[in-house]
A protein has these predicted regions:
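Noncatalytic alpha-helical scaffold of FAD-dependent oxidoreductases
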Residues: 1-228
Length: 228
């Protein structure tokens, strides 16, 4: 938040860093949920039980549906119809990370996930992470034009924020989000599906203003990690 604000919130004069050993092993867990609410609540649930994934990502089901219409190499999404959560666990042994991942799977059963996959090999893990990294490009390929925003809100406010973001869509313009569940950073993408240029320019101004007001109302910031 402070780095992204580029000096508008505070000026850092001194930083003390503590180095930790590089993790030896990691285990990626990909979970599919039927509802956005349960997907976004999953991190709070596992955190309450002491699990601390090194990465926690979420992808809206609209993003996945769009990706499936394009010719992509990401075969893992073929049967995905819900919202995706990535949890990546790291540690000093394979047993350690596997134990964390299995405990996570057990905990989230109360939210009735549609599926949960342990992604074991480095090649499979890279395929899933490549899909996540390619999201912006995929959305740009799909839409006539695209505008991206980068808001951040408290993690507890993610469900209500994402609900409001989805409500910004119109018949000709789709608004969706994905991002970092672990810090509340949402990459909001406004997609021109079939609006003409003049309507698009007016709509993007209105939608952006509503989005920025939403971020502030949710105790967040207009800029997450990419600056102003």
């Amino acid at each position: 938040l402070l780095v992204g604000s580029e000096g508008t919130l505070a000026i850092i004069t001194e930083i003390t860093l503590r180095l930790i050993p590089k993790p030896i092993e990691n285990q990626l867990l990909v979970i599919e949920f039927k509802t956005l609410k349960t997907a976004l609540k999953s991190l709070a649930l596992i955190s309450k039980h002491g699990l601390r994934p090194c990465s926690a990502e979420f992808i809206d089901k609209q993003c996945i549906a769009i990706a499936k219409t394009l010719k992509t190499p990401f075969i893992g999404i073929k049967n995905i119809t819900g919202y995706l959560i990535y949890f990546d666990f790291d540690g000093d042994s394979k047993k350690n990370v596997s134990t964390q991942a299995i405990q996570c799977i057990d905990l989230i059963q109360q939210y009735n996930p549609l599926s949960s996959q342990l992604i074991n090999t480095p090649l499979e893990q890279e395929n899933w992470w490549s899909f996540r990294r390619s999201m912006s490009t995929l959305l740009k390929t799909y839409a006539k034009s695209k505008v991206s925003h980068d808001i951040v809100v408290p993690i507890s406010n993610l469900p209500s924020t994402m609900d409001a973001i989805q409500n910004l869509s119109t018949k000709k313009i789709t608004v969706l989000g994905y991002g970092h569940l672990g810090d509340g950073n949402i990459h909001v993408n406004v997609l021109n599906i079939n609006a003409n240029e003049s309507d698009w320019k007016i709509a993007i101004t209105n939608i952006s203003e509503k989005l920025f007001r939403l971020a502030l109302d949710q105790a967040g910031s207009l800029t997450g990690e990419h600056g102003i």
